[in-house]
Amino acid sequence: MTSTLELKADKMLKVQFVGDDDVLNHILDREGGPKIKKERAQLLVNTQKIIKKPENELEEDDQEVLKDHNYVEVLGQDVQESLKNGSATDGGNKVYPFQNRKHPEKMAKLASELAKTPRKSVLLNMKNDPKITIDIPQCSKGHSSSDKSQLKNNDKSEFLSTAPRGLRKRLIVPRSHSDSESEYSASNSEDDEGVAQEYEEDTNEDILSQKIQAQNREVSAPVFRETPSKKMKREKTSHLVEKYFEAHSSSKVLTSDRTLQKLKRAKLDQQTLHNLLSKVSPSFSAELKQLNQQHEQLFHKWMLQLHLGFNIVLYGLGSKRDLLERFRTTMLQDCIHIVINGFFPGISVKSVLNSVTEVLDHVGTFRSVLDQLEWITNKFKEDSSLELFLLIHNLDSQMLRGDKSQQIIGQLSSLRNIYLIASIDHLNAPLMWDHAKQSLYNWLWYETTTYSHYTEETSYENSLLVKQSGSLPLSSLIHVLRSLTPNARGIFRLLIKYQLDNQDNPSYIGLCFQDFYQQCREAFLVNSDLTLRAQLTEFRDHKLIRTKKGTDGVEYLLIPVDNGILTDFLENEEEEL
């Protein structure tokens, strides 16, 4: 490590010293002590200003400073001569052979003496380390005369080695590995406090103290300790995470499997259940009677609005079947009317048109539903004296909510002499109608909340409390088949047609599997025996078919559904196609 002092342009004084780490390692190697990690040298010392002094005074001051530290006497015998001559090579040759350990006892003695001697006035400016920027003023009571002259002339630039001071610091205070990565931090030891108190007498006290405070903030990294609230919050979060995984790690199913099907009591038939429910006394009977009387007062108003070209739809909580029945018995005794129970599982738009043509005394059949609708329209246009009232319970039922069914019923209601009054119960029933259908129906909406039980409307639905007959209604059949693929529906349609063709055959036990496979293969519905068996398994799971073996061991297929329902299903399929 090299420190350079410029005295003049023609005279150059250079002093070369060995670094702190090399001196310390040399001493500890001799004494067998532990080695300390190398640190960066802190040598460059600056004062605020440089004032030119006479040449003789500069030389004397420099020599006194060097003699005070006793560096020249220890580090090399011929260094003073090289300094006088201004030679840099001679001094370096005498310094670097120091590593040959020519004077080990003398170096150990020097180290112990320097550890006891008071420190000199030094200003550190650690420019070599980018992490540390700090200036620390230090002084001692035991200054020599040369040191006092140096303090008076603070504008002068000095290049002094801090090896003795750094060595003493390492011997007194061992280096601790703090969380901060800086290699130097401001110390709060007694020595530094004494130095700071003595330096307060200096004229630059305020400026230097501000620098120290600013640089201390840069050097010492703040240690943020966790507050109790943050610690509790972190522990609470960790507990929540642990509880989440504990709750989801269990493979045990907590859902109960106790259903009504596992009850040991025998299931009731429909008549027994109806008798038991009829014995239950209704609550709020007086209020319900008064509410129904308010609705009955609207009957004449409804009749007037129907003749004015409007159709009436009733909505609200509770069954409206009894209300429409009272309207029929009160106002339509002398009129032609048709009551359609939309909640019936076997109802379809075809059956609605058949009822209308039956009232009009038509004999014959129609090729399609559209032909039948066209005939009804022409009949009412030809005879203006014809009047027909249609009462439809549950117009939004599963069998009538289709787009084609609503379109046909809307065209019927748009005729001049057909009057429609219907009820809806589903919350989203108005979504069935777009603007075109709304214009056909020409509705007037009436809220008729009755709070009555849906006894008749739900009587055809499957219940866990009632024994099942085993027959599949048309609504369930359509619902199941709509969830299947087109090929699956085609396979089932072939089986229906074959069964309807043989309905008059008393010895018919079903369709042979091999014959059925051949028909499906010819219709390009299946390509292998396994494909057909997989599809039949799905039908069997939905209870659409039943298989049995004959006396010859051949497998036969049969649909356990009434032939009338199968006929309605085929008609419904043809209408949709």
From Swiss-Prot:
The family database entries (Pfam families) matched by this protein are listed as: RecA-like_ORC2, WHD_ORC2
Top-level taxon of the source organism: Eukaryota
BP-aspect Gene Ontology terms: DNA replication
Q: Which GO terms describe its cellular component?
A: nuclear origin of replication recognition complex
Q: Where is the composition biased (Acidic residues)?
A: 189-204
Residues that the record marks as modified (Phosphothreonine) are T117, T227
Q: Where is this region: Disordered?
A: 83-103, 133-204
Molecular function as annotated in GO: DNA replication origin binding
Question: Record keywords: Acyltransferase included?
Answer: no
| Phosphoserine modification, residue list | S249, S281
Task: Cite the repeat ranges for Involved in LRWD1-binding.
Answer: 1-100
Chief place of localization? nucleus
Q: Which ranges are annotated Basic and acidic residues under compositional bias?
A: 144-158
Does Phosphoprotein show up as a keyword for this record? yes
**InterPro entries named in the record:** ORC2, RecA-like_ORC2, WHD_ORC2
- Signal peptide bounds: none
Q: Which keywords accompany this UniProt record?
A: DNA replication, Nucleus, Phosphoprotein
State where the protein is found: Nucleus
What family is this protein classified in?
A: Belongs to the ORC2 family.
Q: How does it assemble?
A: Component of ORC, a complex composed of at least 6 subunits: ORC1, ORC2, ORC3, ORC4, ORC5 and ORC6. ORC is regulated in a cell-cycle dependent manner. It is sequentially assembled at the exit from anaphase of mitosis and disassembled as cells enter S phase. Interacts with DBF4. Interacts with MCM10. Interacts with LRWD1 throughout the cell cycle; this interaction, which occurs only with non-ubiquitinated form of LRWD1, prevents LRWD1 ubiquitination and hence stabilizes the protein. Interacts with POLQ.
PANTHER family annotated for this entry? Answer: ORIGIN RECOGNITION COMPLEX SUBUNIT 2
Q: What is its biological role?
A: Component of the origin recognition complex (ORC) that binds origins of replication. DNA-binding is ATP-dependent. The specific DNA sequences that define origins of replication have not been identified yet. ORC is required to assemble the pre-replication complex necessary to initiate DNA replication. Binds histone H3 and H4 trimethylation marks H3K9me3, H3K20me3 and H4K27me3. Stabilizes LRWD1, by protecting it from ubiquitin-mediated proteasomal degradation. Also stabilizes ORC3.
Q: What is this protein called?
A: Origin recognition complex subunit 2
